[in-house]
Structure formats: C-alpha cells, structure tokens
From Swiss-Prot:
Major location (coarse): plastid
Membrane-related topology note: Single-pass membrane protein
Name of the protein: Photosystem I reaction center subunit IX
A GO CC term assigned to this protein in UniProt: photosystem I
Pfam families: PSI_PsaJ (PF01701)
Compartmental location: Plastid membrane
InterPro entries from the UniProt entry: PSI_PsaJ, PSI_PsaJ_sf
Domain of life: Eukaryota
Residue ranges of the TM segments: 7-27
Name of the gene this protein is made from: psaJ
Biological processes, Gene Ontology terms: photosynthesis
Organism: Cuscuta reflexa (Southern Asian dodder)
Function: May help in the organization of the PsaE and PsaF subunits.
Length: 42
C-alpha cells in the first residue's frame, strides 16, 4: 500500500488528472455556451 500511495503522489499522475479535469471543464463550458467569444450576460 505504501508503494501505491507513492505512485499516486507522483507528478505525472497528478498532472494527468489535473489536465483531464481541466479538459472536461472546458468541454462542458463549450457545451453550454457554444462558440462564446463574448459572454452577453456581463
């Protein structure tokens, strides 16, 4: 279990999870606001 926790704290794993979450967030924003160069509700 100690080696598994060491693996999960590795930088490549954390950066992959972070970039995956960021990509999912951008995809969802583009799904609700397609091609929004300006946001008209400001």
């Amino acid at each position: 279990m100690r080696y598994f926790k060491t693996y999960l704290s590795a930088a490549p794993v954390l950066s992959t999870l972070w970039l995956g979450a960021l990509a999912a967030l951008l995809i969802e924003i583009n799904r609700f606001f397609p091609d929004a160069l300006t946001f008209p509700f400001f």
